[in-house]
């Protein structure tokens, strides 16, 4: 690795994350691109998260512990303040990366110097670590993709790599628990081209931890986002019809799930 190789800051936010953390950290340590630092923000964990992290013996680590539970995107912003990298990436503790994820993305940026944001396809894992499916079967959009994102938001934060300066000028809305990345990347897509690697470079894990609670928060945040941003996007020539329809379907599915669980 030459001295001119860009430094990558990997942002990892954790809250009682011992279950999958070791597997996640192993995927980071196996990266073929070695010039990275890990910014680990422990969001008031009460389990063995810190012990698992210590056992990993990651040398290029910056560890921070919050003395109170913060909303996720508030915690992400605080972690970002500690980052020194030229590029920023995000890896949550229940997910993992392919070993060449960072290398492929750095090489893509080198070949496309006008780009500031990049994402990729990914696999979805179930709780038993088995690949459940490839998330996106069709080609992912690239370039100016705001219209597409409003119809089908395809960017997963664990696949994103973004220019440090751009992210520091446009931080996450810290009031969000779930849709902070949606809010940020959608707004950035109006001003910047977004690059795509069609190859799946990450593994997103689905599990039942607080699932119903998270769905309710997601619906509430998305409804609030539409209310606050609809006029701005319409004035810019975009339609939020598909997004509102998606929210409607999500509400219906959640009600049905609740009825089934209650045995009504």
Predicted features along the sequence, with ranges:
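N-proximal low-complexity "stem/linker" segments adjacent to membrane-targeting elements
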Residues: 1-29
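Acidic helix N-cap motif at the loop->helix transition within catalytic regions
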Residues: 19-22, 47-55, 96, 100
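A conserved acidic beta->alpha catalytic loop
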Residues: 27, 42-51, 92
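Short beta-strand/loop segment that forms part of the nucleotide-sugar
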Residues: 36-44, 64-66, 93
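Glycine-rich, basic loop-to-helix element that forms the pyrophosphate-binding segment
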Residues: 66-83, 104
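Short aromatic/hydrophobic "clamp" motif used to bind/position activated sugar donors
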Residues: 88
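Conserved donor NDP-sugar-binding/catalytic core segment of glycosyltransferases
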Residues: 100-132
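Conserved nucleotide-sugar donor-binding catalytic segment
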Residues: 138-218, 222-225
